[in-house]
Design a protein with these regions (language model features):
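Vicinal oxygen chelate
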Residues: 2-11, 40, 62, 69-73, ...
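Short N-terminal signal/transit or membrane-insertion segments
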Residues: 10-13, 56
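Short, well-ordered beta-strand elements within core beta-sheets of diverse protein domains
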Residues: 15-18, 84-90
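Core segments of cupin and vicinal oxygen chelate
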Residues: 17-65
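Short secondary-structure boundary/hinge segments and terminal tails
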Residues: 48-50, 79, 137
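Short, solvent-exposed loop/turn segments at the edges of secondary structure
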Residues: 56, 80-82
């Protein structure tokens, strides 16, 4: 029996974000918000178009080791809540800082969701949330869930109090 040889190549998934004309602006915005982030490459349209010659076509950027590509593709497509980026946050200070920056000019929603100024959906999730919602004591888990459903920006202390039955 032959064994399949393990591949030494590692697949990497790169989210490809379609903007109308704001790819460079959005990429600069995102790298300004998250630590360990940078612009990697900017490609421009040539004579073949479809964008104006020398205008930005794509911007490759990195957020904390995860690569993204932003495209100036025109107005045909818009972002929706069907796709969102989850940011796992250790502390309330991290949630507060990211919430303030990402929601500025955008729209806050329930349960830690927001849309940024470009319409991209984000979820700012405390790393403790799966533990609270997955508690084997269903009453505790239910209290944490009910508290979360009432929140926009998630509040770790309030979630813990609800989980314990003291809030």
């Amino acid at each position: 029996m032959r064994r399949r040889k393990e591949s030494t190549l590692m697949q990497q998934i790169t989210p490809f974000l379609w903007f109308d004309t704001q790819a460079e602006e959005a990429a600069n915005y995102y790298v300004s918000i998250f630590p360990n982030s940078r612009i990697l490459k900017i490609a421009r349209y040539g004579e073949a178009g479809p964008g104006p010659r020398d205008s930005v076509m794509t911007v490759s950027f990195e957020i904390n080791g995860q690569q993204f590509t932003a495209l100036n593709g025109g107005p045909q497509f818009r972002f929706s809540e069907a796709i969102s980026f989850v940011v796992n946050c250790e502390t309330q200070a991290e949630i507060d800082a990211l919430w303030g920056r990402l929601s500025a000019g955008g729209k806050e929603d329930r349960c830690g969701w927001l849309k940024d100024r470009y319409g991209l959906s984000w979820q700012l999730v405390p790393t403790v949330l799966p533990e609270l919602l997955g508690d084997k004591d269903s009453a505790r888990a239910q209290r944490a869930m009910q508290a979360m459903l009432q929140m926009r920006k998630l509040d770790i202390a309030a979630l813990r109090r609800a989980h314990q039955g003291s809030g």
